[in-house]
């Protein structure tokens, strides 16, 4: 598969996001990533999707190769605005969309901000907290995930060192080799001394978790596009409220992947690509 073409896209708040354009002539399919990740981990999925479409994966603010001025908030409102900025830059009008975790919420935020933007969506455990989610419903400044992110190791001796470490322990030990390689090679940046450092720095990732959107669920009923929500066999967190997100939608469908985890798109690219193609009507 050829390398996608990176497009710099001005968004709100002085942010520049990156749209990785895989080319193709046809309707646009936009892919939106999880917190702490980037658009290029969708590469193995895109390679398995049908031809005849223009696949574009986005680096949301604070992630991948995006450019963010100092002091910009990681509020998830901005993530939805990043999606809209890419749709506008592509002159697409409306798109079919794929979203994972935070990226799923960003897709829905874009549709809520501008109805008609999303024709159909496939979302893996979108972070859209129901009102009864209890401790999982995070609020600004109060996030166990943020605390974990701030402890994350940022620097390794080399790309190979990252691949060896991540591939030998959960959760990445369950990830498909193609997806792990895409995540590492495009999620770290080489430094002058040859070491590599996370592109999404741990304080940025923590800030994203702390600003997790908490009111999106209340507006799901107004989203009229067909949305398929995928849930995994994880026993807590996003897996527990994924069915409720599907049920809150007029045209919501729920799919269950009991043998996969929250990292499902990285764990089984073949099966997930087939599910995306079916849900979005990609021939």
Task: Place the predicted regions along the sequence by residue.
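A short loop-to-beta-strand scaffold at the N-terminal edge of the catalytic core in hydrolase folds
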Residues: 12-22
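Conserved HGGG/HGGXW glycine-rich cap/lid loop of the alpha/beta-hydrolase fold
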Residues: 21-68
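Active-site loop/oxyanion-hole signature of alpha/beta-hydrolase fold enzymes
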Residues: 44, 56, 60-98, 102, ...
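Conserved hydrolase catalytic core segment
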Residues: 94-136
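A catalytic-pocket lid/entrance helix-loop region that shapes and gates access to the active site
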Residues: 127-156
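Conserved alpha/beta-hydrolase catalytic His-Asp/Glu region
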Residues: 153-211
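Conserved serine/cysteine hydrolase catalytic core
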Residues: 188-247, 256
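Catalytic histidine-centered segment of alpha/beta-hydrolase-like enzymes
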Residues: 257-269, 273
């Amino acid at each position: 598969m050829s390398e996608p073409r990176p497009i710099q896209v001005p968004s709100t708040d002085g942010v520049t996001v990156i749209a990785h354009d895989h080319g193709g002539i046809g309707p646009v399919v936009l892919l939106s990533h999880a917190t702490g990740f980037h658009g290029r981990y969708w590469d193995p999925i895109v390679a398995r999707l049908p031809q005849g479409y223009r696949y574009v994966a986005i680096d949301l603010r604070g992630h991948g190769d995006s450019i963010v001025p100092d002091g910009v908030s990681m509020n998830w409102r901005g993530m939805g605005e990043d999606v809209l900025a890419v749709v506008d830059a592509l002159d697409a009008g409306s798109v079919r969309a794929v979203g994972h975790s935070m990226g799923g919420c960003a897709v829905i935020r874009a549709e809520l901000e501008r109805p008609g933007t999303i024709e159909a969506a496939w979302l893996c455990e979108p972070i859209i907290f129901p009102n009864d989610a209890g401790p999982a419903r995070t609020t600004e400044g109060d996030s166990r995930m943020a605390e974990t992110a701030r402890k994350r190791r940022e620097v390794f001796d080399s790309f190979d060192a990252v691949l060896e470490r991540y591939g030998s322990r959960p959760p990445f030990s369950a990830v498909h080799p193609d997806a792990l390689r895409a995540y590492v090679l495009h999620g770290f940046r080489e430094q002058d001394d040859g070491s590599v450092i996370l592109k999404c720095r741990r304080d940025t990732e923590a800030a994203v978790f702390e600003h997790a959107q908490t009111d999106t669920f209340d507006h799901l009923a107004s989203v009229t596009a067909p949305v398929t929500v995928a849930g995994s066999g994880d026993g807590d967190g996003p897996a527990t409220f994924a069915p409720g997100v599907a049920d809150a939608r007029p045209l919501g469908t729920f799919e269950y992947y009991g043998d996969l985890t929250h990292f499902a798109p990285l764990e089984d690219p073949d099966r997930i690509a087939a599910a995306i193609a079916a849900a979005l009507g990609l021939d």
